[in-house]
Amino acid sequence: MTDTPNSPSKSTTKSASSSTKVIDSLHSKIDELTDELTALKQSHQELTKKHSITAKKNDSFVDQLANAKHENDMLSALLKRKERRILDLEDQFNELTSQNESLVLSNKNMKIRCENLQSNSNANIAEFERLKISYDALIASQMEYKNHYQQELNSLQTAFDNYKLENTRRFEELQTSIVSNDKDIDTLLDSLTNKRKAMDNIYVNKNNKVLQLLGNLAHLAKLHGQDTKSQVEQNVSVIEQLLAKHPDLQEKILEKEKIEVDLAEIIAHSNDVLANSSFDEDTTLINSPDLENNQNFNTTHSTSGSATPNSNSHSLQSKKRKNYKRNSLILKESPPIISENVPSSLPKKPQVNNNLINIPKARSKFNTPPTTPRQFTNHNNDFEVTHQWNGNNNINNHRRNNSVDSRSDNSQHRRNNSYDSRSDHGQHRRQPSQQNNNYNNNNYNNNNNNNNNNSNNGFVKRSGSVRNVNNYNNNNGNANNNGNNHGNKSKRRSTYNNNNNNNSKRNSQLFDNNFVLNV
């Protein structure tokens, strides 16, 4: 069958051939693209390998760069140190150079000085030779002077011997004239008697004032003891309230303050002190026994209820130390919280003190008060009260200058107007009487300062009550040596002086010389 242009078979054949071409072309393109993809994959793999190798090289280069930078910094620091070292060495070199130059200059100066000293030495040797010659000549002249003055001394010795003989004769004449002047001496003795009486009255007034001050002190001590007792009672009540409110108070104190406190012992100690302390009775003064028999009273007095202040204090304190701790506190590695001036414990019940305390008779001849308060060792006493009574220390400093016995010049200035016509001004009196007067002066001067309270002057220690009162005992000793002779005005001075050793008492002993405070 013939194909026509418009026949369906022809068109089908054309379309089949064109699709085959397209398929072939597509297959060829696919093959080309497959080949190209394969080539690209291979190139990509190669580039990936090259990239990894390049990255590793880059990392190694970065590490090398960091190492090089670090090495560069180290080298820069080392270079700076080297430069500083060079500068230091240059400074040292310059300093050593300057020292060398100064040493060279000093060496030159020392050489010049040595030359000058050598020249001076030569000049001194020549001067020494010249002075030696002059010294020999001077020795010869001095020997001549010595012989001359020796002769003059011999003549002066002869004149001095003659002068001594003349003065001896004159002294004997004066001695005879003194015998005729005993009436003046008797008049002076009468005047001295009146002055002694006036002085005794002054002593009595002073002692009464001291008694009044002591009474005031005892009253103040009582008030202070009562106040202290009330404070202790308040403290005990406060501690008991705290214990009732906080039973574990002791553990808390130990935990917070690092201090072990025995509160039960503190309360027991305080209650014992409160039970044994009493300040309700008044303080009174009692008289002492006879003063002539109390010389060794402190060592022999052993009546019941009395003891010496020291033994009483030590016995009480020894009992306290045995039964109680000092502050009832055990401090463990903590700073001190209690001042040394705070009393360690409260006083026990005061004892009746009938002891009589004697002040030693050895008194200072200078009637001056102490410049500073005396300090006493606190033998575990609970309280220490220091008062200084300066008002009574200077009584004996105001004696009239015409008084004979209170001066240290040993009667060299007795009524100089009676002997103004003589060149010795009344100093050369009859020797035996003068010796007696010297003894009287020494005896009186050793005892006229006995009201200074120089045994613990004006200080009172107390523990709960006034217990140690040996500070106010005035020992008048042998001051009144004229007790039996003033009534007879016609007796001579020798008779008056023969009674210097009598232990008669002066009127100021109304103070009783020794007293105690009875609580």
Curated annotation (Swiss-Prot):
Coiled coil location: 20-110
The keyword Translocase is assigned to this record: no
Keywords: Coiled coil, Endoplasmic reticulum, Membrane, mRNA transport, RNA-binding, Transport
SUPFAM superfamilies: Myosin rod fragments
GO molecular function, one term: mRNA binding
GO biological process: cellular response to starvation; endoplasmic reticulum inheritance; filamentous growth; filamentous growth of a population of unicellular organisms in response to biotic stimulus; filamentous growth of a population of unicellular organisms in response to starvation; intracellular mRNA localization; mRNA transport; symbiont-mediated cytolysis of host cell
Major site of localization recorded for this protein: endoplasmic reticulum
Pfam families reported for this sequence: SHE3
Cellular compartments annotated: Endoplasmic reticulum membrane
Compositional bias per record (Low complexity), positions renumbered to this chain: 7-21, 436-457, 468-487, 495-508
GO cellular component, one term: endoplasmic reticulum membrane
Disulfide bridge map: none
Region (Disordered): 1-22, 285-513
Ranges of compositional bias, category Polar residues: 285-316, 365-380
Membrane topology: Peripheral membrane protein
Keyword Glycoprotein: no
Membership in a protein family: Belongs to the SHE3 family.
Protein role: RNA-binding protein that binds specific mRNAs including the ASH1 mRNA, coding for a repressor of the HO endonuclease. Part of the mRNA localization machinery that restricts accumulation of certain proteins to the bud and in the daughter cell. Required for the delivery of cortical endoplasmic reticulum into the emerging bud.
Protein name as it appears in the record: SWI5-dependent HO expression protein 3
Organism of origin: Candida albicans (strain SC5314 / ATCC MYA-2876)
